[in-house]
Amino acid sequence: MNIFKLSRTDMVRLLYSLKGQGEHSPLDILVQSANMSAEKAANHLEIPEFLTRYERKKQKKEYGLSTNEIVELGNLCELTSLKSTAIQNWVKRDIKDLIGHPELGKKYSIEQAVILLIVRDLKSIYDFEHIRAILKVAFNTISDRSDDVISPIAYYESCAYVLDAIHHQDTPSMKESNLQEIAEQETERLRHRFEELNDSQWLKIRQIIAITVLSILTFHIQATAHKMTADIL
């Protein structure tokens, strides 16, 4: 079985689909992204069981996820690495106040799952104290979606667009000042998506998106270095 990684932009499509939104099912998105037929994907890809179960549901409403399913979901995506033990510790102890109780019975909502994905992205650089402070700027009362400045999925989606733009830069620079400038410039291009925000709110959100993108790139560099080390030891 092949381990296939979704691009961040395809991951966003998958998340919306799990919320019951969009034209394609989660499994369709996975198969399309792998550029395979459904039959070939079933034989060659490691497809999480919960995606298959969702496919069998007659009414495509939001799908709740267990912590193990959130790990499976996160690990479908590029530049992401999650472990079940870490997620369980986060929701029970480290960020219990951020994530709150499961919103869909005993399962977590897609927005709650996205918060965990964002926490993982930020964890490359920040401790939980700093992560709380960052997320409170975006979400105010973190466990209450009604007072969000932007929604968790809009936050995650914005990071995906910026990462994709950086990936397609002709000559991406590794200079610290240039990386910051590129991340901020590409984030600024998303301003039209947040017309409801005033300039002061947008400046804060822009910086949060940019620093999250830099944290994701940091994880990528760290993971590459670890892999290179493993190859010689």
From Swiss-Prot:
It holds the Pfam family DUF1836. This is Uncharacterized protein YkrK. It comes from Bacillus subtilis (strain 168).
